């Protein structure tokens, strides 16, 4: 990579005017790209990315307009890592000339990525995949680019507590989202186009939450990042909760959808008659941009 930059620098030297040579000064007619990346739609959860930490890495593709055309037709501008520190974002120099470049970014950086239109996504790792594009074209005249990173996935959150009169311990040992019947709205693997955040679903499967706690009268949250779900045609998904050795389930209604960049929050109260999601006033099921929305009351029933 350094040899390629050196070769390019030599070409720039040859392009300088004779007057510059006579003065003993040679100017490089290019500048190095600088970025400022921020995360859009902040939220709070263990799985989602809300702020940068030292050592975080973005992958950048500097292109001639579209993702498949590297800047100046040079592969050196593909999948360049930018690393975050207290000083901001740094990388090896990405030199720009007068030609305008479109900058695409993704998180987290994958050194093995060769097809940026098909970045592998695996829900079992609970990685919050982000994508973004520079707000302006980059060139020697504009080398500072701002990038707002967006969430490509969705999130499901269950906020759970028990009533004071609940007669058992309230030991939660598992939460599973399941496909029902032949329909497969739930997927565990997909690929992402880093320029648009669009996902191609590849492997259907159930989603297991990391859940283990003894419920009290104070709500505690359990969350999972999920591949977005299009509006279901029927009752194609269930949530199964294992509490005090028993299974309680909820079948999501037709039309349920979980959109990318949103988190879907379900408030659950455990009582002697089972679990209740939501309330009689229509509260308790909230959708937030990770734009609040509220749905009606939902009941969970024991698995027979």
Stretches with model-predicted labels:
Residues 2-11, 15-304:
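Sec-type signal peptide cleavage vicinity
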């Amino acid at each position: 990579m350094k040899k390629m930059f050196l070769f390019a620098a030599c070409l720039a030297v040859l392009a300088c005017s004779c007057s510059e040579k006579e003065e003993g000064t040679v100017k490089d007619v290019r500048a190095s790209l600088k970025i400022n990346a921020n995360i859009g739609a902040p939220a709070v959860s263990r799985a989602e990315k809300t702020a940068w930490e030292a050592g975080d890495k973005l992958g950048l593709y500097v292109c001639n307009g579209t993702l498949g055309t590297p800047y100046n037709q040079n592969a050196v501008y593909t999948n360049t890592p930018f690393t975050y520190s207290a000083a901001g974002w740094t990388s090896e120099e990405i030199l720009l000339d007068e030609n305008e470049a479109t900058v695409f970014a993704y998180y987290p950086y994958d050194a093995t990525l060769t097809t940026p239109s098909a970045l592998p996504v695996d829900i079992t790792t609970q990685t919050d995949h982000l994508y973004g594009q520079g707000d302006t074209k980059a060139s020697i005249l504009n080398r500072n680019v701002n990038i707002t990173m967006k969430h490509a996935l969705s999130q499901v959150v269950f906020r759970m507590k028990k009533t004071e009169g609940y007669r058992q311990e309230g030991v939660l040992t598992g939460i599973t989202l399941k496909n029902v019947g032949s329909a497969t709205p739930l997927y565990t693997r997909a690929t992402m186009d880093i320029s648009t955040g669009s996902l191609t679903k590849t492997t259907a499967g159930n989603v297991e939450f990391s859940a283990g706690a003894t419920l009290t009268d104070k709500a505690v949250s359990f969350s999972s990042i999920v591949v977005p779900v299009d509006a279901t045609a029927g009752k194609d998904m269930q949530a199964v909760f294992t509490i005090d050795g028993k299974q309680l389930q909820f079948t999501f209604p037709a039309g349920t959808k979980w959109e990318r960049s949103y988190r879907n929050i379900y408030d659950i109260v455990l009582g002697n008659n089972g679990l209740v999601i939501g309330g009689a006033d229509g509260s308790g099921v909230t959708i937030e941009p990770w734009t609040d929305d509220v749905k009606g009351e939902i009941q969970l029933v024991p698995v027979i």
